[in-house]
Amino acid sequence: MVKTEICGKGSSQGSEEERLSQLPDHLICVILSHLSTKDAVRTSILSTRWRNLWQLVPVLDFDSRELRSFSEFVSFAGSFFYLHKDSYIQKLRVCIYDLAGNYYLTSWIDLVTRHRIQHIDISVFTCSGFGVIPLSLYTCDTLVHLKLSRVTMVNVEFVSLPCLKILDLDFVNFTNETTLDKIISCSPVLEELTIVKSSEDNVKIIQVRSQTLKRVEIHRRFDRHNGLVIDTPLLQFLSIKAHSIKSIEFINLGFTTKVDIDVNLLDPNDLSNRSMTRDFFTTISRVRSLVIRHGTIKDIFHYMELEPLQQFCYLSELSAVCSISNLEMLLNLLKSCPKLESLSLKLVDYEKNKKEEVMSSTVPPPCLVSSLKFVKLESQLLGCGTELKVARYFLENSTILEKLTLKIDYMYKDEANVNHIRQTLHAVPRCSSTCEVVIHSLLY
């Protein structure tokens, strides 16, 4: 939503207004559609040319905070729904900060679902409960993009969303597990799914089964009773952020899928959980592009203490967030990536009470000798020098490295410190004679 102010006209503002006024009505309506409805109405005072253009905008955007009282908000929004009761509405966005709005929300959604609505974005922020989505939304045959935040989706017998391509659920409460299953399975052209949720609902096992989904993001607080099933053969991108999850099952996950994993398994060393852990690592070992974080790296290390880690034979691109106390764990992972070509490594200090590890493996991982071409290091540390040690390790041990990039996010007092880092790295003996070293830093 864009905030705008109508000010007095100066000469430059007048000329800009004249240029805008020369545009055809449909282009002006496109511009107005990027404003809130309240701000779009305010443009009517610009000139007689603009007086009624806001009425042609097929986008309704309401926020109850923009009015002095909730009753004033209901009156303001209601007048627009009455104005559009017989016309096309392309997009509806409603943000409500009063639970009393649930009654009006139902009637508004019922109205727009009868008028070829394509985009719906509903958010209800109250401390006493969630707004309830009416039944009409579950059978809207023109809806393309649905975004819901802090609402309740009830159990329904019939769901039909034939045009829905993007589904974004942010802290949505489901009355039972079948509701989410029905919505996904009854959206035959669904391509993108995002679920952000706490563990406090009635969905214990999230099942994502779709023949059309290309992008899935699950960011959820799981507990020891929760699980996840992914069955999406056409998936191109998968992001899972979950803590203390009981089980994860992948079905038909293609090796071309880019996977972003931030998962803490309950206990990879638990015998009852080891089979699931093995299957989990076996599946992600087949992908070509992988993003992992500190917790997952630790799980991999603990798993490797019990049995050998599967080889990531297809992996060519790896991005990792790694604590400086777990650098040896990272090296052990790299030993299972024989064809890795690109490594992006972000150094953090999550475990401040633990000693920093030095990458001192006498035998470098095979990928450093045969395949690794690009290394990007990013540091948010306060000048402890770890990034220099890591950079030195890759420069001294990577046979065919083409480029090493060091990005430093912390503040340096002067250019001299950056020059010192640059000179230090350029003085490091390089195993690859063609390797280029690039340093990016922010000076304040």
Curated annotation (Swiss-Prot):
Location of the FBD domain: 356-408
CDD domains: F-box_AtFBL13-like (cd22160)
SMART domains documented for this protein: FBD, FBOX
InterPro entries from the UniProt entry: F-box-like_dom_sf, F-box_AtFBL13-like, F-box_dom, FBD, FBL13/AtMIF1-like, LRR_dom_sf, LRR_FXL15/At3g58940/PEG3-like
Keyword flag Lipoprotein: no
Keyword vocabulary terms for this entry: Leucine-rich repeat, Repeat
UniProt cross-references to Pfam families, sorted A to Z: F-box, FBD, LRR_At5g56370
Domain F-box: 17-63
LRR repeat copies, ranges: 103-123, 124-150, 151-171, 172-197, 199-224, 226-252, 273-299, 300-321, 322-347, 369-396, 398-423
Protein's name according to its UniProt entry: F-box/FBD/LRR-repeat protein At5g53840
UniProt source species: Arabidopsis thaliana (Mouse-ear cress)
